[in-house]
Amino acid sequence: MTWFIDRRLNGKNKSAVNRQRFLRRYKAQIKQSISEAINKRSVTDIESGESVSIPTDDINEPMFHQGRGGLRNRVHPGNDHFVQNDRIERPQGGGGGGGGDQGQASADGEGKDEFVFQISKDEYLDLLFEDLALPNLKKNQHRQLNEFKTHRAGFTSNGVPANISVVRSLQNSLARRTAMTAGKRRELRALEEDLETISRSEPVQLLEEERLRKEIAELRAKIERVPFIDTFDLRYKNYEKRPEPSSQAVMFCLMDVSGSMDQATKDMAKRFYILLYLFLSRTYKNVDVVYIRHHTQAKEVDEHEFFYSQETGGTIVSSALKLMDEVVQARYDPAQWNIYAAQASDGDNWADDSPLCHELLAKKILPVVRYYSYIEITRRAHQTLWREYEHLQATFDNFAMQHIRDQEDIYPVFRELFHKQSSKSEA
């Protein structure tokens, strides 16, 4: 009786190759499903991955079949209704009118359930932040921010099926079989030579010839029992993450918490900043994040207070810009740091303060930052702050602004602001 023993280390993940191939083939549909799903749950809920649904029509495989219409000869085996040369009437309706009369709940229309499967946390985040990067990142420092890229690093004896090296594994198999059977093959050749000598000698030595044939058969059986391939032979392509030359970076998060920001607007702003935080922590190892909340006064806070504090008040946006400028001058030398900022507001500001915001950005902040993004979250018409910022966008290439009306706009706006651009790094 033959027993098969599965000694693979990844025996519980035997379909890994097919899974990776499926994710690559239907990446566009999966990313579309993820962009829709992210608006239906908290972006911090990532531990369980995501259930992704794909329309069944998108995963149909091509198939060959005979076209409708025309004349053709067919053989119907085993029928008891027709004999040779009988004519069979053509079915009515040329469009494949099958289906029967079952399912009378609806007079017309048909469909199929969508294909639903689960992706892991890592797969979810990889697809969520694919092709995103901090714009204009200057490669001039090597101390804090470590960005890693994957490189080939030889072969390893452990790995996943997707990384198996067939050529190297077969080479190892050949070397092992050669080493394990070399002595037996030498002995086999010697016995075959003895057998040939005895068979030609006179008189015929039947007993000796029989013994030699038996030993030869036993040796051949032993050689054939050496397995063609063993887990010892398997080699996998090895990859390692190497730090790439990169620079120190700091992200300023400026959030308006004034009384004009209702709870729904604040929640959308927080969702945007949570996305930003996940993106930075996923893509870069070390990035400083400075959190600033403002109403009539601005205050630098920690992460918990930034997201959960209930403090509110009037609206003077320039207070946050002044505080950011002070922090930059005190802690972040523009010659040593890549400085980024993301500002979220409903656009409601004291009218006389908006020109001051324009002046602060144009003269102090934009000349020293790599990228400044402004997100206005409102369903109302734009006010003076937006119009002042429009002048900045026309003048500065490192200033971007986007408008969020509903929760569904958050992820598309985020991707638009941080999509990966062509490399323009300065020396």
UniProtKB/Swiss-Prot annotation:
Residues 92-102 have a biased composition (Gly residues). Residues 72-109 are annotated as: Disordered. InterPro entries: UPF0229. It comes from the Bacteria. Residues 77-90 have a biased composition (Basic and acidic residues). Belongs to the UPF0229 family. This is UPF0229 protein KPK_3252.
